[in-house]
UniProtKB/Swiss-Prot annotation:
CDD domains reported in the protein's UniProt record: ASKHA_NBD_ROK_BsGLK-like
Protein's UniProt name: Glucokinase
Residues holding ATP: G8, I9, D10, L11, G12, G13, T14
GO molecular function, one term: glucokinase activity
Signals that turn on the gene: Constitutively expressed, activity is maximal at the end of vegetative growth and declines during stationary phase when grown in rich broth (LB) (at protein level). Expressed in a similar fashion in minimal medium containing glucose, fructose, trehalose, maltose or sucrose.
GO biological process, one term: glycolytic process
Known EC number: 2.7.1.2
Temperature dependence of activity: Optimum temperature is 32 degrees Celsius. Enzyme is stable up to 40 degrees Celsius.
Family: Belongs to the ROK (NagC/XylR) family.
Cytoplasm listed as a keyword: yes
Organism per entry: Bacillus subtilis (strain 168)
Cellular-component GO terms for this entry: cytoplasm
Disruption phenotype: Loss of glucokinase activity, no growth phenotype on glucose, fructose, maltose, sucrose or trehalose-containing minimal media.
Length: 321
């Protein structure tokens, strides 16, 4: 039997991650290319790099049955249209049509956090569970909600925008979405750095963070791991707000798995345990009892694996027609 591969693509602000993945969710080859931040040549770049990689591997193009791609922002999955991606200047952008035209391969488009959630459900910390919440903590905060094995899209593609749940109703920091006080302004890497700088400026206690040039969220968690008081205050504050948001979500959705992903989640147990403490306090007891909170297992591969999952499902639908 001929090999069957799917192309999983995760469009990020800095890089486009790509992988050829078989029908069992096993990565055969993976690589990345820089993102054109104007958004103008992204599909051309993807088409060229897929062709180039297939040539390098001496594989025929027909081995790739379908492409599954994740893009930032709300997506009309049926039409394959990205409603808006601010960083790339896209508005009502027909990504599916452009991608299929350039590659000659059928494609399906989904929100980037949603494909990460599907990847973790299929092959990662979701462990095959059908009711999963993934929150991605990176430069921003994204989210994917899976209910009964299906991504929650909502009426116009805005389902799962966990990063824009209001955490501070009055006096919160401004968010890229135009509101203030979103959890993204607190639990993202940029939010953590902002909070740390505010605490350092007002601190009477000594802290190693004062001497850190180009302060990062990683610096904050490393200092907290060494019991730096200011760093611990920052982590406690972040975990408290994130635990509250996740507790409210769990009370509404009753998931079996809550997965923390993205670069900030590399803080590991230090972050997870503190988030869980507030979560258990805030969630409806029966919902809290049912939910396991864990760190994402797939790292940067979650998106491409989730992309392959939706690609495989679309391909199977057409096989059964």
């Amino acid at each position: 039997m001929d090999e069957i591969w799917f192309a999983g693509i995760d469009l990020g602000g800095t890089t486009i991650k790509l992988a050829f993945i078989n029908q069992y969710g096993e990565i055969q080859h993976k690589w990345e290319v820089p993102t054109d931040k104007t958004g103008d040549t992204i599909t051309v770049t993807i088409a060229k790099t897929i062709d180039s990689k297939l040539d390098e591997l001496q594989k025929p193009k027909h081995i790739i049955k379908y492409i599954g791609m994740g893009a930032p922002g709300p997506v009309d999955m049926a039409a394959g249209v990205v409603y808006e991606t601010v960083n790339l200047g896209w508005k009502n952008y027909a990504l599916k049509n452009h991608l299929e035209t350039e590659t000659g391969i059928p494609a399906v488009i989904e929100n980037d956090a949603n494909i990460a959630a599907l990847g973790e459900m299929w092959k990662g910390a979701g462990d095959g569970a059908k009711d999963v919440i993934l929150v991605t903590l990176g430069t921003g905060v994204g989210g994917g909600i899976i209910a009964n094995g299906e991504i929650v899209h909502g009426i116009n593609g805005a389902g799962g925008e966990i990063g824009h749940i209001c955490s501070i109703p009055e006096g919160g920091a401004p968010c890229n979405c135009g509101k203030t006080g979103c959890i993204e302004t607190i639990a993202s890497a940029t939010g953590i750095v902002r909070i740390a700088k505010e605490k350092i400026a007002n601190a009477k206690k000594t802290t190693r963070l004062k001497a850190t040039e180009q302060l990062s969220a990683r610096d904050v968690f490393e200092a907290a791991g060494e019991n730096d008081e200011i760093a611990l205050e920052v982590v406690d504050y972040v975990a408290k707000h994130l635990g509250l948001v996740l507790g409210n979500l769990a009370s509404s959705l009753n998931p079996s798995k809550i997965v923390l992903g993205g670069g900030v989640s590399r803080a590991g147990e230090l972050l997870r345990s503190k988030v869980e403490k507030t979560f258990r306090k805030c969630a409806f007891p029966r919902a809290a009892q049912a939910a396991d909170i864990s760190i994402a297992a797939l790292g940067n591969d979650a998106g491409v694996i989730g992309g392959a999952w939706i690609a495989k499902n679309e391909w199977l639908k057409h096989q059964n027609c």
